[in-house]
Amino acid sequence: MRMVDDYKMVLHNSAIVINNCSPNDFPTLSRRFHIYDPVRHRLDPLGIYYDQANRKLYMPRGIDVDFVKRKVQTSMEDEFTSTVVHNHQYGYVTKKIGMKKRPRDDTQMEALKFVLCKDKYQRNSGKSQFGINLNTGGGKTFLCSCILSYLGIRSIVITAQSGILDQWKVRLQEYTDIEESEIVKIEGGPMISRILNGTSTLANKSLYLCTHSTLQNYGSTHGWDKIGELFKKLGIGIKFFDEAHQNFQNMALIDFAARDVWRTYYVTATPSRSDRQEDIIYKLYMKNVPSIDLFNPEVDPHTNYIAIKYNSCPKPADVNACKNSVYGLSNPPYIDYLMRNERFWVMFDYIFSLIYKTGGRALFYIGTNAGILKVKQRILFNYPELYNDIGIYTSISEHKQEDKNKKYILTTTKSAGAGEDIAHLKYSVILAEPFKSEVLARQTLGRTRDPNTTYIELVDVGFKQLIAYYNAKKPVFSKYASGSKVMTVDNPKLANLGEETRLSIRTRFRNVLEFNVHGPIDAITYVEGPKMMPAVYFGNNSLNRTLAE
């Protein structure tokens, strides 16, 4: 009887394995999964993995099998053999999980039929990979909860950040009646080792949560075959990749290591990569993976896009200092330049004053931690009463999760990127973190989930690279924003805005207590004598109190 390794090509649920080979055996096939690194001037593999010790090439299951077969056959002199592996060994949840909520609309109901292969989607019941490409706020976590409840198969959720795992746990307990003890967060290599050694009591739970970095660190240290053993030990039958477009290579390695897991769901609102080369390979990776995208341009857009163009008037030396020979513009020196540019601060004061007057929570994107601290200082200088309302949501904050609940949040696109759930945001402001990526544009647009919200982008036309960034993202906002508006601030208008803001702040500080004190104040009562005396004096006589015995 033939063993699996005796076949030249083996089809698993989430991988194609070519045995006894070298990547040089079929260069045209291998080259399609390599990208050029302009910094190190070399080709790096992406979406594939070659096990040199065992002479095995791992490729994505979503590509055309016949195409791979032809390429492998042309490199062989011996007979070509292949087989399909159906090794579905998984565990079930320890207790039936019920749903607390029903699908909120027809869109969620249609998506639910897709993920469970019901009605017209029954043809996908033999598939092992599915793409859930719903828009931000479309209920992707709810659908995954329904999958766990309906199928009752042990599952694992894999995300980029530990904080996102906490969001998953909260949402799963909100949508289902799963017991908290049945949700296990896998943290660190020692915990994985205990599970593999059989010395942990956590190997028979219903749902596991883990980050890409935890699995990547353990796999690169102990071998990726250990990740496959981990999934078998836990009885994992379903794996969910949250924000599947991120950590692409790591996701592929997990797919290859845990290639016999029954089903894999790739969950993302933006099934694309920012880099063009990487996006081509990502699309190839997902080519034959059935997916669903129910975006409705008549109903789903809910955030208005406003581009505010101004000229920071950089000197030639400033432009040269911000240049990058590979990427065109280097963000850190550009942001440092903005922090020293008076025109930028005029625009910031104007934008912040509008948000302050209209009310509502706001998220500001600033590309560096140094820039974030400068912006915070500026706000506190002009609005000292907001000391407890400003949060920094990056690694420099000791209370990062608490700061995410503040009224005004200063962050970066990396810290508050894909998958972040920040409730009741009214404004998202791209203040000092320019980017060209259409994927990032959709992600940042998706941070405001409530209706009638606003997305503001400050565009510095003094740099030609930033004009190109703005033009590259326009199609995204045309499609996914509820409306688009462009506001141009020329030099005279900018001067007027600066004067208006200066006078407004001056007026605020003239009667500072009127801004900082809300309602009547009970002054101190003195009982030393019968004499009537004013105890506390304010700049405004209406706030004075006369105190009696």
Question: Predicted regions: what is each one?
Answer:
Residues 152-174, 369:
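Conserved Walker A/P-loop ATP-binding site and its immediately adjacent core
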Residues 203-220, 404-417:
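Conserved two-lobed SF2 helicase motor
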Residues 292-355:
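Conserved interdomain linker/interface between the two RecA-like ATPase lobes of SF2 helicase motors
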Residues 454-509:
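A conserved SF2-helicase RecA2
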Residues 246-300:
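Post-DEXD/H (motif II) to motif III coupling segment of the RecA-like Helicase ATP-binding lobe
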Residues 395-476:
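Conserved RecA-like P-loop NTPase helicase motor core
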Residues 82-130:
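Conserved pre-motif I regulatory segment
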Residues 124-147:
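Walker A/P-loop
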